[in-house]
């Protein structure tokens, strides 16, 4: 895969430039555009993934299905589809927006900061997974209600963005409704 960049944003969310993805994520990460996606199978189960140990931020942490950064000239939906193919080897239905205004800043135990405007999407998988081990070290198909109970009981066991997304009342409602689309 070619070198990815992040789209830098000002405080109002207006693009101001780009920076190579690896260089962008430091102890003083600039605000940039990202996306987060929750994938469900035909049984209505949520795909929860464990980030590869080689990841710069939050290695080995359980999180929602797939996250990434749109590239210059790429729509969020195109970025979600691209990362699903790259990380999970899976085809999906058109991504649906479930939390368009999500923005967060969090610091991992190694001091790496995520500072993102990060719209959240959900989609159904339409093919079998072919996991890229460079991105994902483990995965499980889970009942959404069980995952949400786990997040409520042990938020430290999941990525901070997953916890923040799942504890937003409207996003939780939309995710729950999404499980009924099967």
Swiss-Prot record:
Catalytic site positions: 67, 116
A UniProt-annotated Pfam family: NUDIX
GO biological process terms on file: dimethylallyl diphosphate biosynthetic process; isoprenoid biosynthetic process
EC category name: isomerase
Pathway: Isoprenoid biosynthesis; dimethylallyl diphosphate biosynthesis; dimethylallyl diphosphate from isopentenyl diphosphate: step 1/1
Keywords (A to Z) from UniProt: Cytoplasm, Isomerase, Isoprene biosynthesis, Magnesium, Manganese, Metal-binding
Cellular component, GO, one term: cytoplasm
Major location (coarse): cytoplasm
Binding site for Mg(2+): 87
Cofactor dependence: Mg(2+); Mn(2+)
Cofactor binding description: Binds 1 Mg(2+) ion per subunit. The magnesium ion binds only when substrate is bound. Binds 1 Mn(2+) ion per subunit.
Disulfide bonds: none
Catalytic activity: isopentenyl diphosphate = dimethylallyl diphosphate
EC number, as in UniProt: 5.3.3.2
Binding-site list for Mn(2+): 25, 32, 69, 114, 116
GO molecular function annotations of the record: isopentenyl-diphosphate delta-isomerase activity; metal ion binding
Domain Nudix hydrolase: 30-164
Entry similarity comment: Belongs to the IPP isomerase type 1 family.
Database matches in NCBIfam families: IPP_isom_1, PRK03759.1
PANTHER family named in the record: ISOPENTENYL-DIPHOSPHATE DELTA-ISOMERASE (PTHR10885:SF0)
Official protein name in the record: Isopentenyl-diphosphate Delta-isomerase
Species, as recorded: Escherichia coli O127:H6 (strain E2348/69 / EPEC)
